[in-house]
Amino acid sequence: MNMIMAMLANISISSCLIIIAFWLPHLNIYTEKASPYECGFDPMSSARLPFSMKFFLVGITFLLFDLEIALLLPLPWALHSTNMFLTTLTSFILVSVLALGLAYEWMNKGLEWTE
């Protein structure tokens, strides 16, 4: 009997929440809410508007450095391996490549936003 009551309670609460979820959005309809929004750009305008190349380059640089950092995440588990020298050498090379890439971007003023 308790199982049936629990199922009925769950079904009734779920049904009420579904009805409320479909009913609430229809109360306040504004033009701003109905319009699509994508990264601050108007999606109905021309798709060939120029954008900042600096923004694109900083975004690509962030993506590359983020992927390199993601390669370092399994490092604590790799330190428990039997060949400690190879693990340490690999992590040192990875961090060195990351540091050299950062130094290269810094020297070529790739990280400066205004220019």
Swiss-Prot record:
<dbReference type="Pfam" id="PF00507">
    <property type="entry name" value="Oxidored_q4"/>
</dbReference>
<dbReference type="GO" id="GO:0006120">
    <property type="term" value="P:mitochondrial electron transport, NADH to ubiquinone"/>
</dbReference>
<keyword id="KW-0999">Mitochondrion inner membrane</keyword>
<comment type="subunit">
    <text>Core subunit of respiratory chain NADH dehydrogenase (Complex I) which is composed of 45 different subunits. Interacts with TMEM186. Interacts with TMEM242.</text>
</comment>
<feature type="transmembrane region" description="Helical">
    <location>
        <begin position="4"/>
        <end position="24"/>
    </location>
</feature>
<keyword id="KW-0679">Respiratory chain</keyword>
<keyword id="KW-1278">Translocase</keyword>
<keyword id="KW-0472">Membrane</keyword>
<keyword id="KW-0812">Transmembrane</keyword>
<dbReference type="GO" id="GO:0008137">
    <property type="term" value="F:NADH dehydrogenase (ubiquinone) activity"/>
</dbReference>
<keyword id="KW-0830">Ubiquinone</keyword>
<keyword id="KW-1133">Transmembrane helix</keyword>
<keyword id="KW-0249">Electron transport</keyword>
<dbReference type="GO" id="GO:0030964">
    <property type="term" value="C:NADH dehydrogenase complex"/>
</dbReference>
<dbReference type="InterPro" id="IPR038430">
    <property type="entry name" value="NDAH_ubi_oxred_su3_sf"/>
</dbReference>
<protein>
    <recommendedName>
        <fullName>NADH-ubiquinone oxidoreductase chain 3</fullName>
        <ecNumber>7.1.1.2</ecNumber>
    </recommendedName>
</protein>
<keyword id="KW-0496">Mitochondrion</keyword>
<keyword id="KW-0813">Transport</keyword>
<comment type="function">
    <text>Core subunit of the mitochondrial membrane respiratory chain NADH dehydrogenase (Complex I) which catalyzes electron transfer from NADH through the respiratory chain, using ubiquinone as an electron acceptor. Essential for the catalytic activity of complex I.</text>
</comment>
<comment type="similarity">
    <text>Belongs to the complex I subunit 3 family.</text>
</comment>
<feature type="transmembrane region" description="Helical">
    <location>
        <begin position="55"/>
        <end position="75"/>
    </location>
</feature>
<dbReference type="GO" id="GO:0005743">
    <property type="term" value="C:mitochondrial inner membrane"/>
</dbReference>
<dbReference type="InterPro" id="IPR000440">
    <property type="entry name" value="NADH_UbQ/plastoQ_OxRdtase_su3"/>
</dbReference>
<keyword id="KW-0520">NAD</keyword>
<feature type="transmembrane region" description="Helical">
    <location>
        <begin position="84"/>
        <end position="104"/>
    </location>
</feature>
